[in-house]
Amino acid sequence: MHAYRTHTCGELRKSHVGETVKISGWLHRRRDHGGVMFIDLRDHYGLTQIVFNPGSPGFATVERLRAESVITVEGKVVARDAELVNANLGTGEIEVVGGAVSVQSEAAELPMPVFGDHSYPEEIRLKHRYLDLRREQLHKNMVLRSQVIASLRRRMVAEGFTEYQTPILTASSPEGARDFLVPSRLHPGEFYALPQAPQQFKQLLMVSGFDRYFQIAPCFRDEDARADRSPGEFYQLDIEMSFVTQEDVFNSIEPVMRGVFEEFADWEGKGRKVAEGPFVHIPYAEAMLKYGVDKPDLRNPILCSDVSDIMMRDDVTLAVFKKIVGGGGIVRAIPAPNSGDQPRSFFDKMDAWAKKEMQAPGLGYMRFVEENGALTATGPIAKFFEPAALAALAEKAGVKAGDALFFSAGDKTAAVRLQGQARIRVGEELGIIEPGVFRFCWIVDFPMYEWDEDNKKVDFSHNPFSMPQGGMEALLAADTVEKQLDLKAFQYDIVCNGVELSSGAIRNHRPEVMLKAFELAGYGPEVVEAKFGGMLNAFRYGAPPHGGIAPGVDRIVMLLAETDSLRDVILFPMNQQARDLLMGAPSPVDERQLKELNIRLAPVVKPQP
């Protein structure tokens, strides 16, 4: 018989009754029932219940051991009585009558229990991540992650893609976030950078004559943590293709994304589905108008509208809205379907939320009702609208009697931000978010440039390597700031249930077009040559039209696992302060290492309170 196990803790079934077996695992839970000891033994594969009678050779051993001690048990498989069968457990039809017990490792007193669903502070969980990972749900999440990555690889190969590995040590480049820098011992005073993404390398692969590249790529960005972004590193399904249009990229990636989500839609019996039909295409401007965000959750049926023009009518006397629109601001309407009978507290709650969470002046509203066959409205601001104005407002906003309408007003940036978050909030409060479905969309026609208010200049809105729609002709014709801000890029995002999974683009593969695009953003040729010279020079020797995308693996798994935090799908994540509490990183290093790297530390200057 094997030294540790003949079967795993999730393997034994009724067909094994009568067999003598040996299983090993962690002592998950112990229960004393009138002198008879029951334990659950756990390993990677599941749980097995073991019963020890008072005369059993292992009784005294399991009685004294703490939870999470690692033991090997030899015993006989017996069937449970019908009324004791646990249908929620794979091994629930049997139990093992325990005999000899070998202790492989005794557990000290635990800083946090593994059994149960108790909530513990993140600091304790991350410091003792090896205990946290033993907990059932987190353990399942990590297995799901592995299965998702395997599925992605399999599907990419089936679509004709080939996996290649790109360098981890590379040059620093201004791609958005701060770089993690690595000092060079051989070249004092010079630094490598960990790649924020394999962006330039995957494009160079296309220039090198390869096609349909993919990689499960680690990416490193020195940025603050968010629920949907983990500090330090993350993984993405990095993709690039040659001789493709935007539609070609969509047609290649949709089957992969749909297939993965369909494969795991029923994970853990969740009974979800992927919405039928091709992924919806939504222009960026339309997304910002209808949803107030560029990553809309299409499970929410609420569609917003711009009602600024209605506020300037003569039969509308709401002075505050007129002043906002007259000063260049906007007013957006957010419908609240079938909420006209909601109590006043619902509307007060929304207004309080806007003031506290969004730092907005408030969230005006009105309720639409029918009186004597005519549509009218009630609420604090309804009195400022004549019947004809109310009818026009209802028609434009798409509301009817029994609905309510919230208003977001202010300068465009603030009003749209409040509109987007209010739409989400109203949908959640009314319980109208469609359950059990994954709804994808492509956001297209992103602006090439945006206005940098801090530096009072035009700059790239997203990826500087995107091909402008219209090419060089469009760039040459953009001779004013207004025209430059109207330029669109062949750039796109893929979104699922309000989560941006990836940005992508058709690349700017022509050196003269790239230099002109950077020129409009205020970067001279010397800057482009210094930062992107390797890629620019490669383009001078013949570059194919190419494009790609890079869906985030962590976010895909987060959606499938139905968790709100990326840390729940990453094995050993950092905390919010970008510290690895388990390994103690970052940490000081000794003087010898610094000397080898020709580094001298400056005194840390603490900010004044």
Swiss-Prot record:
Keywords: Aminoacyl-tRNA synthetase, ATP-binding, Cytoplasm, Ligase, Nucleotide-binding, Protein biosynthesis. Its main location: cytoplasm. The record marks H33 as: Important for tRNA non-discrimination. Gene3D superfamilies: Bira Bifunctional Protein, Domain 2, GAD-like domain, Nucleic acid-binding proteins. It catalyses: tRNA(Asx) + L-aspartate + ATP = L-aspartyl-tRNA(Asx) + AMP + diphosphate. ATP binds at R221, D222, E223, E500, G552, V553, D554, R555. Residues 199-202 are annotated as: Aspartate. GO terms for molecular function: aspartate-tRNA ligase activity; aspartate-tRNA(Asn) ligase activity; ATP binding; nucleic acid binding. Transmembrane segments: none annotated. GO terms for cellular component: cytoplasm. Homodimer. NCBIfam families: aspS_bact, PRK00476.1. Belongs to the class-II aminoacyl-tRNA synthetase family. Type 1 subfamily. This is Aspartate--tRNA(Asp/Asn) ligase.
